[in-house]
Curated annotation (Swiss-Prot):
Record's function text: Catalyzes the NADPH-dependent reduction of 7-cyano-7-deazaguanine (preQ0) to 7-aminomethyl-7-deazaguanine (preQ1).
EC nos: 1.7.1.13
Transmembrane segments: none
Catalytic residues of the enzyme: 56, 63
This protein's UniProt keywords: Cytoplasm, NADP, Oxidoreductase, Queuosine biosynthesis
Protein name, as recorded: NADPH-dependent 7-cyano-7-deazaguanine reductase
GO molecular function annotation: preQ1 synthase activity
Localization, UniProt: Cytoplasm
Entry GO terms, CC: cytoplasm
Gene coding for it: queF
GO process terms (BP): queuosine biosynthetic process; tRNA modification
Origin species: Geobacillus thermodenitrificans (strain NG80-2)
Pfam families, alphabetized: QueF
Catalysed transformations (reactions): 7-aminomethyl-7-carbaguanine + 2 NADP(+) = 7-cyano-7-deazaguanine + 2 NADPH + 3 H(+)
Length: 165
């Protein structure tokens, strides 16, 4: 199998760009995608994003998290540098943890149209409580819809020991 051709990569404007600018304002338009060369196969792509930050919508204090994104692509995959810059754009975005993971998932669904996706935020404690929102989605009317229901019901059967992360 040959590598990707320049023509296939022409829409990726952020990867390899040495003049990267970081947006401090939430911007879903930063997300870029490329063609999945293996649409005939189910496989997971997982991103571990340990440097996510956003702001509490009330106090404007910073919140920190590791965001885990797993998806089964269909025709498109998200490009990782664009994902990094997109997640960075939450830096000054004021929203609750639950909102952030759902916004991330919705934006990725809009740009990729995956077969299945899940987003799990593991936020560091504030006030002695850590919050770990989880959301997922499977394409309606397919086996992925059933998969989403099953994974939601079973996503945290073996909770981790919390030691302030």
């Amino acid at each position: 199998m040959n590598g990707r051709k320049d023509e296939e990569l022409k829409d990726l404007t952020l990867l390899g760009n040495q003049g990267t600018t970081y947006s401090f304002t939430y911007d879903p338009n930063l997300l870029e995608v490329f063609d999945n060369k293996h649409p005939d196969r189910d496989y997971f792509v997982k991103f571990n994003c340990p440097e996510f930050t956003s702001l509490c919508p009330k106090t404007r204090q910073p919140d920190f998290a590791t965001i885990y994104i797993s998806y089964i692509p269909d025709k498109k995959c998200v490009e990782s540098k664009s994902l990094k810059l997109y997640l960075f754009s939450f830096r000054n975005h004021g929203d609750f943890h639950e909102d952030c993971v759902n916004i991330i998932m919705n934006d990725l669904i809009n740009v990729m149209e995956p077969r299945y996706i899940e987003v799990w935020g593991k936020f560091t404690p504030r006030g002695g409580i850590s919050i770990d929102p989880y959301c997922n989605w499977g394409r309606p009317g397919t086996k992925y819809e059933k998969m989403a229901e099953y994974r939601l019901l079973n996503h945290d059967l073996y909770p981790e020991k919390i030691d302030n992360r």
